[in-house]
Amino acid sequence: MNSANPCCDPITCKPRRGEHCVSGPCCRNCKFLNPGTICKRTMLDGLNDYCTGVTSDCPRNPWKSEEED
């Protein structure tokens, strides 16, 4: 159990009522970050990974090749 996390229900380990997420690169203060927020920067401009606003995960930019990851 993670009772120290204010976003986490200590019994279920899921987000508390009214909260979106517990942790992740696109989660801050128990809420999903806004769509378009950079969650992983790359050396190449325009190929950063961005939050979607609906998940706490940081999805891979579909325009990046495997070598650029």
UniProtKB/Swiss-Prot annotation:
The keyword Zinc-finger does not apply. The keyword Secreted applies. Its main location: secreted. Residues 1-66 form the Disintegrin domain. A motif (Cell attachment site) lies at residues 43-45. It is found in: Secreted. Keywords: Cell adhesion impairing toxin, Disulfide bond, Hemostasis impairing toxin, Platelet aggregation inhibiting toxin, Secreted, Toxin. One of its GO terms (molecular function) is toxin activity. Disulfide bonds join 7-30, 21-27, 26-51, 39-58. GO terms for cellular component: extracellular region. PROSITE patterns: DISINTEGRIN_1, DISINTEGRIN_2. Negative results: does not inhibit alpha-1/beta-1 (ITGA1/ITGB1), alpha-2/beta-1 (ITGA2/ITGB1) and alpha-6/beta-1 (ITGA6/ITGB1). Belongs to the disintegrin family. Dimeric disintegrin subfamily. PANTHER family: ADAM A DISINTEGRIN AND METALLOPROTEASE DOMAIN (PTHR11905), ADAM METALLOPROTEASE (PTHR11905:SF159). Heterodimer with VLO5A; disulfide-linked. This is Disintegrin VLO5B. It comes from Macrovipera lebetina obtusa (Levant blunt-nosed viper).
